[in-house]
A protein has these predicted regions:
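Short, intrinsically disordered, charge-balanced linker/junction segments flanking boundaries
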Residues: 181-187
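Hydrophobic face of amphipathic alpha-helices that form TPR/SEL1-like repeat modules
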Residues: 42-49, 53, 76-85, 112-121, ...
C-alpha cells in the first residue's frame, strides 16, 4: 500500500510539473534582477521561447550568461546552444562545444547527448565518432531517449563501436518506450 501511495504521489507531481509552464512575470523579472540564478535561467527561457513575452534572443542570451557566470550548469548548456546557433550572440561553434562539454562533464544528460552530436558532426571540434558514441552512451545510460536512439543506431551500423544487433535492439526498445518514433520504426 505504501508503494502504491508513493507511486500515486510521484505520478501526480510528475503530471503537475509537466503541465507547469514557465511564463514571464514581474515576480520572475524581480527575482532575476536580484541575482537568483534559477530565476535568471527561467527568464532567459521565457525570452528564448516566447513564454509570456516576445521571442528575444539577445535578452535570452543576456540572462543565460548572467546565470552561467554564477556556475548554473543548465544556463551554461543553454549558452552553448546560443553560440552554436548564433542566437543573441555572434556564432562561435568552438565556444559552443567547450560550454557543452563543461555542462556534460558536470552531469547534464541533455548536454551529454548534444556533445555526442557535436562530436559526430564535427561541430566546434574535430569529428570523432568514438567520442560521439561514448557521450551518447553516457546520456543513454542516464535515460535520455534521443541518446538511446543514437546508441542503438551506432550499434546497428557499427559506428564508433563494434556492430551488435542485440545491443541495438535493446537501445531501440528503450528509446521506443519513451516515444521516439524512429526507434519504434526500427523495432
Amino acid at each position: 500500500m505504501t508503494r502504491l501511495l508513493s507511486l500515486i504521489i510521484l505520478v501526480t507531481i510528475t503530471v503537475q510539473m509537466a503541465f507547469a509552464k514557465i511564463s514571464f512575470s514581474t515576480e520572475l523579472l524581480n527575482s532575476a534582477n536580484q541575482g537568483n540564478v534559477e530565476a535568471q535561467y527561467d527568464l532567459a527561457l521565457c525570452y528564448y521561447y516566447g513564454y509570456g513575452c516576445n521571442v528575444d534572443y539577445e535578452s535570452a542570451f543576456k540572462w543565460f550568461d548572467g546565470s552561467a557566470q554564477k556556475g548554473y550548469y543548465p544556463a551554461i548548456y543553454a549558452l552553448s546552444i546560443c553560440y552554436e546557433k548564433g542566437h543573441g550572440c555572434i556564432r562561435n561553434q568552438e565556444l559552443a562545444f567547450s560550454l557543452c562539454k563543461l555542462a556534460a562533464e558536470k552531469g547534464m544528460n541533455m548536454a551529454k547527448n548534444r556533445l555526442g552530436i557535436l562530436y559526430e558532426k564535427g561541430i566546434g571540434c574535430e569529428k570523432n565518432v568514438g567520442n560521439a558514441f561514448k557521450w551518447y552512451n553516457m546520456a543513454a545510460q542516464g535515460g535520455d531517449a534521443e541518446a538511446q536512439f543514437n546508441v542503438a543506431f551506432f550499434y546497428k551500423h557499427g559506428i564508433g563501436c563494434a556492430a551488435n544487433a542485440d545491443s541495438a535492439f535493446f537501445w531501440y526498445e528503450k528509446s521506443a518506450v519513451q516515444g521516439v518514433a524512429d526507434a519504434q520504426f526500427n523495432l
